[in-house]
Amino acid sequence: MDSKYIQKTLSAITEQITKNAAVQKVLDNKFVKEHKYAAAAATVGLGVVAATTIVKAVNCEGKRYNYDAIPNLSFDDESIYDVATIGAGPSGSVLGYYLAREGRKVALLEKKVFPRDKYCGDAVATMAQDILREMGVMKELVDEDLGHFAQNGGFVSPNGNSFIGNSAKELKRDAKYNRGAVIAVKRIVLDEKVAKAAKRMGADLKENTTVENATFDRSTGVWTINCVDSEDNTKKIVYRARVLVCADGSPSNAARQLGYVHTEPNGICSRAYVKNNTTFRYDGVVFYPPSLLPGYCAIIREARDELNYLAYIIPGGKVTNDDLSKYHHQYMTEDPFISAALGPNPDIERMKAAPLRLGGIKKSYDDHLLIVGDAAGFIDPLTGEGIQYAMEGSRLASLALIQAFNERDLSHQSLKRYQDFWMAKFGHEFSMSMTMSLFLYRFPIVLDAAASLIEKRGSRFLAEWAAVMTGVKPKTWFLRPDVGPLIVLEIFGECFRRVFQGKKQIKKLD
């Protein structure tokens, strides 16, 4: 806040105090004059109490929402939805699926008409795979050849160290994983499959519906959601719901309009599908060009032998979101590894881009309100992975809402358990991911050493690495005594090689 504004405000307050007769009477009191310090301390204490009360009121903290004081509250009015989600992507539809399964009346308000595209890396990791199996979607994807499980892959470090291995084969040897590390599914396919699964379960899917605004009536405990037909803006539609869920993606338009999110998305990613007439023969490789750190590029194999070339810009480095197009196209021809993988004349689509909100938001709940998925920043700052956290977060949100409805308590104190759930499951990892991301930007030699270590230890070690990067294992794995010291030793070895063996000769991927 501007210091001149503060001084001006304080001057105005002082002026009003000096003019106030009641205040002057207190200041002229004999006790106050004789005990100035005690009076000052009491005044400060009262000020702190008043400020705390105001903050609690603003943040909706403190006393539990009193439902007995809401004269018109009803949990039985069938004209009112139990829950309405703004957005029917993976987060909104997964939430709708689980709530509908429990008999709750849910409206999924989707701006577009399925099938509709979204831009990301298309990599669906383990937690999301479990949910897709439960929804029956995974069987559809496999039966219709719409997803591709990664069988082999690796990464290329900033200095050009690389290793490609068969992590999937190693994961299958370990019964506790019981699924592939990643399956690539195009979002135009995945989102429709998940939304239709929610609809089959009983959720009311409202496509072609743009939400203009939503208002909460505290006297009835009901949201009024004003919408228009996305193709015919003159056609007005109104829905009413007891709980509003913001599931409208990284821009978080609904949550921003309601005052719960105050920042722009802090990352961005590109996507370009490539017809597989290239020399690339792996399922997935991550490239760490030095100029893009802490971001990265990747090439992922999709179903039916198509590739997905993408670049992620993650906050903390020199590059900004505005640099995405420049680096996306530059690496295609100038990076020795990416250009070799794509070949001289790749049949590649025009670059698409999507914003990213990374690291989670501070508060994702309020009275009769939840914020889920990308809108809540459920994207890992180290890997850019978001689909599995969006889906798992919504599964956890359904548990919180089911319990809240059973208790007939939709207060923020009741719905806070949702925040507790996702923080305990994956949110606590986000701060470590951000720290690691910044650390790798400052010390890229760590990635060089890691690639060398994986090359020495083989596919089993790569599988463990993949388990960490896909959320199966916590990132504290890097601190284990059988991992951390080895990376440190490899860093010393990398330094030695650079000093005594000179500049590394660039090798292409085999």
Swiss-Prot record:
Its main location: membrane. It comes from the Eukaryota. Disruption phenotype: Null cells show a 50% decrease of the CMF binding and a loss of CMF-induced G protein-independent gene expression. The keyword Plastid does not apply. Residues 56-510 are extracellular. The chain crosses the membrane at residues 37-55. GO terms for molecular function: FAD binding. GO terms for cellular component: membrane. It is a single-pass membrane protein. Keywords: Membrane, Receptor, Transmembrane, Transmembrane helix. Residues 1-36 are cytoplasmic. Receptor for cmfA, that appears to mediate the G-independent cmfA signal transduction. This is Conditioned medium factor receptor 1. It comes from Dictyostelium discoideum (Social amoeba).
